[in-house]
Amino acid sequence: MSRFVQDLSKAMSQDGASQFQEVIRQELELSVKKELEKILTTAPSHEFEHTKKDLDGFRKLFHRFLQEKGPSVDWGKIQRPPEDSIQPYEKIKARGLPDNISSVLNKLVVVKLNGGLGTSMGCKGPKSLIGVRNENTFLDLTVQQIEHLNKTYNTDVPLVLMNSFNTDEDTKKILQKYNHCRVKIYTFNQSRYPRINKESLLPVAKDVSYSGENTEAWYPPGHGDIYASFYNSGLLDTFIGEGKEYIFVSNIDNLGATVDLYILNHLMNPPNGRPCEFVMEATNKARADVKGGTLTQYEGKLRLVEIAQVPKPHVDEFKSVSKFKIFNTNNLWISLAAVKRLQEQNAIDMEIIVNPKTLDGGLNVIQLETAVGAAIKSFENSLGINVPRSRFLPVKTTSDLLLVMSNLYSLNAGSLTMSEKREFPTVPLVKLGSSFTKVQDYLRRFESIPDMLELDHLTVSGDVTFGKNVSLKGTVIIIXNHGDRIDIPPGAVLENKIVSGNLRILDH
């Protein structure tokens, strides 16, 4: 906890302390304002307006950060949502499709969140450029999906990438390869906010550059920034002018987040005549999902509650699969007109996520972020849809990558679907150890991806390699202890087996 926050806490515990607390807060805001003004003076003329918008946005967020303390929800007010506010996907699908699918598709814009790097998987550059299936990247698959829609229905669904300053340059270099695809591709940038020193709460950056000493001084402030940066880019007004009505927003690493025509039809032709301004796709929790944000009823509106907002005594209750059965997939359908209205009224309310980081030099900093789904409570007639698990297929680790590269899935026009040869619709639980964390190491350890159609659970730990045409079935646990190595031989069939010890296979 910073010295300033400690001072504030002490001040609050004393009589008449609120006035003292307000003085400290105002002094701190003034100090931050001066620092930001100094930084702005270093902006080149062609970047001045853009930088000013970013720093103004940060100031508003910082002001709110100083006002809010403690958990942001009153647990006593949290209720289960009314049944009609979260619809089962089957009910949406049962309505069928309109006669003229192209007319509803032409009202849609697809937005992919493309601000993340591949560092957690040992890759440099944007995560969207990592190969995930038959040498296709996340971005390749996305373009293929939308091109397939446009060709099939003779439509003009554009793709918009929300980049960050970390991914923008590399992404733009690659976009020329899609020039001959039937997809118009647009990009805009997330804001760039300054990290603040955890003790002084002042910006770490001394100027606008993000090279040299300033490399770690800036950050993209979470995907909740989409509303302001999309509006500021001018694209929002452009699409409204073209007659577009909804954006479908999702993470680019969620391979299940394809355009769903049934959900789109429900939006364009609401059964009760009242248009939904915001739809969140949620899916049933499994054991691994207990920390995911969940939809609740709060003060009469649908609200996304994240684990960080929950008071500590209620965290276990929040994780309970029996009480809170679904979690947010971050597949969102949002009205463009509503975004414009709320943005112009400054009425989009999102909780602040305080994300502590330690820089390479050891300095402790804070970055203030927001999440796109948290804005659900600001929109009118919001709806949750409980979708099948197949619409949530994120690739966060090489364990996830193994699943999507395997014969569990087939690839068609950029979309992955579970193989009909798998008897169970559930996905196996795969845990690969630290030797597999980096994509480069992971690929080196598999001569070919094993047959996993009958696999339930795979755990691999230590120095392990797989030969060609290996088949894994049931529960398979492979543990090579420190100093040992296990080579699974080509053609091996492992069914309900624990493999340990030392097994070397060398070329003769």
From Swiss-Prot:
Residues 502-503 are annotated as: Critical for end-to-end subunit interaction. It catalyses: alpha-D-glucose 1-phosphate + UTP + H(+) = UDP-alpha-D-glucose + diphosphate. It comes from the Eukaryota. It is an enzyme of class 2 (transferase). Residues 457-508 are annotated as: Oligomerization. Keywords: Acetylation, Cytoplasm, Magnesium, Metal-binding, Nucleotidyltransferase, Phosphoprotein, Transferase. Substrate binds at G115, G116, H223, N251, I252, D253. CDD domains: UGPase_euk. It is found in: Cytoplasm. UTP binds at L113, N114, G115, G116, K127, Q190, G222, D253, K396. Pathway: Glycan biosynthesis; glycogen biosynthesis. The keyword Iron-sulfur does not apply. The modification N6-acetyllysine is found at K438. GO terms for biological process: glycogen biosynthetic process; glycogen metabolic process; UDP-alpha-D-glucose metabolic process. InterPro entries: Nucleotide-diphossugar_trans (IPR029044), UDPGP_fam (IPR002618), UDPGP_trans (IPR016267). GO terms for cellular component: cytoplasm. The modification Phosphoserine is found at S13, S434, S448, S461. Belongs to the UDPGP type 1 family. PANTHER family: PTHR43511. UTP--glucose-1-phosphate uridylyltransferase catalyzing the conversion of glucose-1-phosphate into UDP-glucose, a crucial precursor for the production of glycogen. This is UTP--glucose-1-phosphate uridylyltransferase. It comes from Sus scrofa (Pig).
